[in-house]
Regions:
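Alpha-helical transmembrane signal-anchor/signal-peptide segments
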Residues: 97-114, 119
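Hydrophobic membrane-targeting alpha-helices
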Residues: 88-96, 267-271
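Membrane-embedded helix-turn/re-entrant segments that form the catalytic/gating core
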Residues: 1-89, 186-189, 194, 285, ...
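PDZ-domain C-terminal substructure recognizer with occasional recognition of PDZ-binding tails
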Residues: 119, 125-126, 140-182
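Conserved PDZ fold ligand-binding element
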Residues: 113-135, 202
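Functional transmembrane alpha-helices
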Residues: 53-69, 167-266, 283-294
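Pore domain of cation channels
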Residues: 73-84, 257-271
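Juxtamembrane/interfacial segments flanking transmembrane helices
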Residues: 100, 228, 272-285
Length: 294
């Protein structure tokens, strides 16, 4: 319709939008040099093979015939809009329930944090130089670096301090702890602060995705911990079912949280330099731009 060919796959997981000539299954009529265009009367197949030609009514320039810079912008737009969608979902969630600043609510006796001088009300700014905006940043950093010495930069009454500690293993918790608690959500003071912490939320999930990929490569997690499409759909269904008793708004907030996670994860995965993904195609386009030729 209108020069666009629509299709529904047997397994409708995910989706895609391809420019004319972007799919290797399409054959161009004649040469596909820069500036070549489509023949509106070209049939859908060549009549001899199953190779696809142009959709009826398609006009314009082939994807591979335009400049490398134009193709770069088209390919990178997909992952970028994954991150933009994640940001909008984060904006909705934070507007409804607030955010969790990296502030210490309490310090447990006998743990490294108390011994190093941390107090309730302190705000942790960096762990080994890594900036922390959310309390979850603190939690995940310690989770991904168990038992390792950590330099903590924190703020108290407007003044910056630095201390060092080594997380201690807790038999009760089954993991390494420094002995602090936090994660109390706070409503944003303004629209600007909501937008700011929406960015930090997306940043958090991007960092978690990269850290998780590192754990997979190091074989620190099993294949059972990796969720495929079926498991993701099941998780969404479970989330909706468990949230229904709390009202529609809680259901929407939980679904938006899932959307942040999935969109940020998909954006990162698509940028990986693997041939079948957008990242792999970007590598070849960048090489073409550097060389000045395909």
């Amino acid at each position: 319709k209108g020069g666009t060919r629509y299709s529904l796959k047997l397994l409708p997981f995910g989706g895609s939008c391809m420019m004319l000539g972007e799919d290797e299954g399409y054959d161009a009529p004649g040469e596909t040099e820069k500036g070549s265009s489509c023949d509106q009367n070209q049939s859908l197949t060549d009549g001899k093979t199953d190779r696809l030609l142009l959709p009826p009514g398609a006009t314009g320039t082939y994807f591979n015939a335009v400049s490398a810079w134009t193709r770069f912008k088209v390919v990178v737009a997909g992952p970028v809009f994954n991150f933009i969608l994640a940001w909008f979902c984060a904006f909705f969630v934070i507007s409804c329930v607030g955010f969790d600043p990296a502030s210490v609510v309490s310090v447990e006796d006998g743990y490294p944090a108390q011994e190093a001088g941390l107090q309730a009300g302190d705000t942790i700014e960096r762990l080994n130089g890594t900036r922390t905006y959310l309390y979850r940043d603190v939690q995940t950093y310690l989770q991904f670096h168990p038992g390792k010495s950590v330099t903590v930069e924190y703020v108290r009454d407007g003044k910056s301090y630095t201390t060092q500690m080594v997380p201690r293993y807790s038999e009760e918790a089954g993991r390494y702890l420094i002995g602090i608690s936090g994660g109390v959500y706070r409503k944003p003071a303004s629209v600007i602060q909501t937008a700011q912490y929406s960015f930090y939320e997306v940043r958090y999930w991007i960092r978690v995705t990269f850290s998780s990929l590192g754990m997979i490569l190091k074989r620190q997690v099993s294949s059972n911990d990796i969720a495929g499409p079926v498991r993701i759909v099941s998780m969404i269904g479970t989330t909706v079912k468990e949230s229904q008793s709390y009202g529609l708004m809680i259901v929407l907030v939980n679904l938006a949280n899932m959307c942040i996670l999935l969109s940020a994860n998909l954006g990162v995965m698509n940028l990986l330099p693997i041939p079948a993904l957008d990242g792999g195609r970007l590598v070849f386009i960048i090489l073409e731009m550097l060389r000045g030729k395909p």
